[in-house]
UniProtKB/Swiss-Prot annotation:
Binding sites annotated in the UniProt record for heme b b562: 83, 182
Organism: Sylvilagus audubonii (Desert cottontail rabbit)
Positions bound to a ubiquinone: 201
Protein name per the record: Cytochrome b
Free-text cofactor note: Binds 2 heme b groups non-covalently.
Gene this protein is translated from: MT-CYB
The organism's taxonomic lineage, starting at the top: Eukaryota, Metazoa, Chordata, Craniata, Vertebrata
Subunit structure: The cytochrome bc1 complex contains 11 subunits: 3 respiratory subunits (MT-CYB, CYC1 and UQCRFS1), 2 core proteins (UQCRC1 and UQCRC2) and 6 low-molecular weight proteins (UQCRH/QCR6, UQCRB/QCR7, UQCRQ/QCR8, UQCR10/QCR9, UQCR11/QCR10 and a cleavage product of UQCRFS1). This cytochrome bc1 complex then forms a dimer.
């Protein structure tokens, strides 16, 4: 008799996705981040659900409701910090997942890659709106500054910003709608993840060599289920270390001060995972130019497949591209550091140089390096 997992309509889908899935035998730990992102999403949805049971999205009570969660709700402090630091782990995994995709040429799976970019935008939007909800100083001023950027759009900008705010400033209406969107978006993300996986399973996974692996596939279970389980343990360990020993390490002390529209904090900055984009935004003195650069810093990912000039898919055997890739990583770390610094000399210049370098590497230097490597192949 055939196993039920191969015949049952629902179990059959799970079987083809997680059990009998033919997987390349040589995929490294860099391929663990997909499942880790799935785990992060589950953690965020569950902790978020329990937080939403106690949170109130009203300007008068939002801050005190978060305080109430931390002080009076059973293990509320744990749920709150798991959620806040879970977002940080989410972005660490996201950036590593995208970096893996660039390094090993996974972007040649166009549908999977493009849905991944949409997912990245959706997760960033969710995280931004979530940061507004505790209604601390950085919540309020972060929301004011970032939403205000839309006013740079010609003709419709001001009307658009006031429409998003639901008034003439960030206020009760803004907080309520941000809570509504913050609640619904993770479920939209979960649906997009399914589509992301659907397209991935149409082609099968890439592998470090970038060479088709049809001749050497192994079943996902038990080989990669056990490998993913190890990744889960490492992620949970790191998250718990962060939550239980220094829960506020990645947060901003200003967010422990209730929102006050009459008092601007000296340095308005977003959470650490947005600092690289914030640095790119600030490096351009023009408002509209800065907004375009900010959007392009992520949208540039969509252009990468069009600029693939190499005869090899992966960077595994391409030393010049490898050097450029790691320079890009160092550049992103530099931008992250600059984003958290005040707007003064020498940080302004460093930020501008790092921003130019970021776009230059992706749009000019990497395609050129690939062409040079193609020539070297013929020697």
């Amino acid at each position: 008799m055939t196993n039920i997992r191969k015949t049952h309509p629902l179990l059959k889908i799970i079987n083809h996705s997680l059990i009998d899935l033919p997987t390349p035998s040589n995929i490294s730990a860099w391929w663990n981040f997909g499942s880790l992102l799935g785990l992060c999403l589950i953690i965020q949805i569950l902790t978020g659900l329990f937080l939403a049971m106690h949170y109130t999205s009203d300007t008068l009570t939002a801050f005190s409701s978060v305080t109430h969660i931390c002080r009076d709700v059973n293990y509320g402090w744990l749920i709150r910090y798991l959620h806040a630091n879970g977002a940080s782990m989410f972005f660490i995994c996201l950036y590593m997942h995208v970096g893996r995709g660039i390094y090993y040429g996974s972007y040649t799976y166009l549908e999977t890659w493009n849905i991944g970019i949409i997912l990245l935008f959706a997760v960033m939007a969710t995280a931004f709106m979530g940061y507004v909800l505790p209604w601390g100083q950085m919540s309020f001023w972060g929301a004011t500054v970032i939403t205000n950027l839309l006013s740079a759009i010609p003709y419709i900008g001001t009307a658009l910003v006031e429409w998003i705010w639901g008034g003439f400033s960030v206020d009760k209406a803004t907080l309520t709608r941000f809570f509504a969107f913050h609640f619904i978006l993770p479920f939209i993300i979960a649906a997009l993840v399914m589509v992301h996986l659907l397209f991935l399973h149409e082609t099968g996974s890439n592998n470090p060599s970038g060479i088709p692996s049809d001749s050497d596939k192994i079943p996902f279970h038990p080989y990669y289920t056990i490998k993913d389980a190890l990744g889960f343990l490492v992620l949970i360990l790191l998250l718990l270390l962060l939550v239980l020993f220094s829960p506020d390490l990645l947060g901003d002390p200003d967010n422990y001060t209730p929102a006050n529209p009459l008092n601007t904090p000296p340095h308005i900055k977003p959470e650490w995972y947005f600092l690289f984009a914030y640095a790119i935004l600030r490096s351009i003195p023009n408002k509209l130019g800065g907004v375009l650069a900010l959007v392009m810093s992520i949208l540039v990912l969509a252009i990468i497949p069009l600029l693939h000039t190499s005869k090899q898919r992966s960077m595994m055997f391409r030393p010049i591209s490898q050097v450029l890739f790691w320079v890009l990583v160092a550049d992103l770390l530099t931008l992250t550091w600059i984003g958290g610094q005040p707007v003064e000399h020498p940080f302004i210049t460093i930020g501008q140089v790092a921003s130019i370098l970021y776009f230059s590497i992706i749009l000019i230097l990497m395609p050129l390096a690939s062409l040079i490597e193609n020539k070297i192949l013929k020697w």
